[in-house]
A protein has these predicted regions:
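P-loop NTPase catalytic core of nucleic-acid-dependent motor ATPases
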Residues: 20-129, 143, 194-197
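Conserved ATPase-coupling elements of RecA-like P-loop NTPase cores
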Residues: 138-143, 185-186
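Conserved catalytic/switch belt of AAA+ P-loop NTPases
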Residues: 143-165
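AAA+/SF3 P-loop NTPase mechanochemical coupling elements
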Residues: 120-125, 158-176
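Walker B catalytic acidic pair
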Residues: 133-135, 145
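Short glycine-/polar-rich loops that comprise or flank the Walker A/P-loop
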Residues: 125-128, 152, 169-172, 188-194
Length: 206
């Protein structure tokens, strides 16, 4: 038993440092809780991904590609809250969320509306992307919390039975809704949201 314990790595504590280009599991004696991703960019054709991106972002396709690039190259960069809305079915909204999960793997978490309202947030506070497939956060306090989270640099993590701990907060939000009119409260002049109305898919190739 003692011999085995001697082989177990020892750390001074934990950190959450996102980096997709030069990932480190240990940083100055601290265990990095951010997880590596297996994908490495390669030059070549990406017709299915391109088709999905063009469908989701339409005339803002280049901005959509910039968004993806910033997620990969500058994961701590603050970005707008993406809100995809459509009353129609089969629009590709959920497909886009699953695509983000496939690219960034365990650094993407699917939340429910209740997760945002819970005081316990340790399972999502250190993620790159927090996505919600059917968002309905139409209370004023929900809206204020979401806006604050999208711009804050630090956040207090709380888990059951543990003390609160303040960490760097870099998560981005991608929200989907079948409610085109009031999935979240957005005040006039608010610039923290990037709202896209998504059309029905012409085919299921994506």
């Amino acid at each position: 038993g003692k011999n085995y314990l001697a082989t177990v790595p020892k750390y001074d504590g934990f950190c959450t440092v996102p980096n997709h280009l030069n990932y480190q599991k240990e940083i100055e004696g601290f265990l990095n809780l951010y997880e590596p991703i297996e994908h490495k960019p390669q030059q070549g054709e990406f017709s299915h991904i391109q088709s999905l991106m063009r469908h989701i972002f339409g005339e803002q396709y280049e901005l959509g590609m910039d968004y993806m690039q910033l997620l990969y190259l500058q994961p701590t960069q603050k970005l707008p809250i993406v809100l995809l809305v459509s009353e129609e079915r089969n629009t590709g909204k959920s497909t886009f969320l699953n695509f983000l999960k496939a690219v960034f793997e365990n650094n993407v978490t699917f939340n429910t509306n209740e997760d945002f309202r819970s005081q316990f947030n340790s399972d999502w506070a250190g993620k790159l992307l927090i996505v919600v497939d059917e968002v309905l956060l139409n209370r004023r306090e929900d809206s204020e919390r979401l806006k604050n989270l999208s711009t804050t640099l630090s956040y207090k993590v709380e888990a059951k039975g543990k003390d609160r701990d303040e960490i760097a907060f870099f998560a981005k939000f991608v929200l989907c809704s079948n409610n085109e009119y009031l999935p979240v409260i957005i005040d006039a002049g608010e610039t923290r949201y990037w709202v896209r109305k998504i059309d029905r898919l012409q085919s299921d190739d994506t």
